[in-house]
Amino acid sequence: MRFTKDHEWVALDGDVATIGITAHAAEQLGDVVFVEVPEVGRQVKAGDAFAVVESVKAASDVYAPVTGEVVEANEALSGAPETVNAEPEAGGWFAKVRVADPAELDGLMDKAAYDAFVANS
């Protein structure tokens, strides 16, 4: 699993990346009440907002950490947004993206680097 400075996580399986927000991000947001996931077939670019998460505290964009095509969206989140709080780095994933350039993941942090980033923020 790799992590971004915007608190997204990426798990790569072959050429498909599963993307969600980190446990730290979910904790900071508080109780998630709404999630908008991207449409399947949508082309996304690394750094672009591609999903929205709203909590009792705030609304936040979720940024695509990689460039590619959305091949699956976690539609279950629309009926159960609290899954993002309960399982942020598992069942609370937002989308799966077929990665155009796997080298983009090289610039992301591993768990130890992300934990240090959060601790120093």
Curated annotation (Swiss-Prot):
Domain Lipoyl-binding, first and last residues per copy: 16-98
Entry's Gene Ontology BP terms: glycine decarboxylation via glycine cleavage system
List of residues that carry N6-lipoyllysine: 57
GO cellular component, one term: glycine cleavage complex
Record's keyword terms, sorted: Lipoyl
Cofactor: binding details: Binds 1 lipoyl cofactor covalently.
Record's signal peptide: none
HAMAP family per UniProt: GcvH
Family membership: Belongs to the GcvH family.
NCBIfam families linked to this entry: gcvH, PRK01202.1
Biological role stated in the UniProt entry: The glycine cleavage system catalyzes the degradation of glycine. The H protein shuttles the methylamine group of glycine from the P protein to the T protein.
PANTHER family to which the protein is assigned, alphabetical: GLYCINE CLEAVAGE SYSTEM H PROTEIN (PTHR11715), GLYCINE CLEAVAGE SYSTEM H PROTEIN-RELATED (PTHR11715:SF3)
Quaternary organization: The glycine cleavage system is composed of four proteins: P, T, L and H.
Record protein name field: Glycine cleavage system H protein
Gene name for this UniProt entry: gcvH
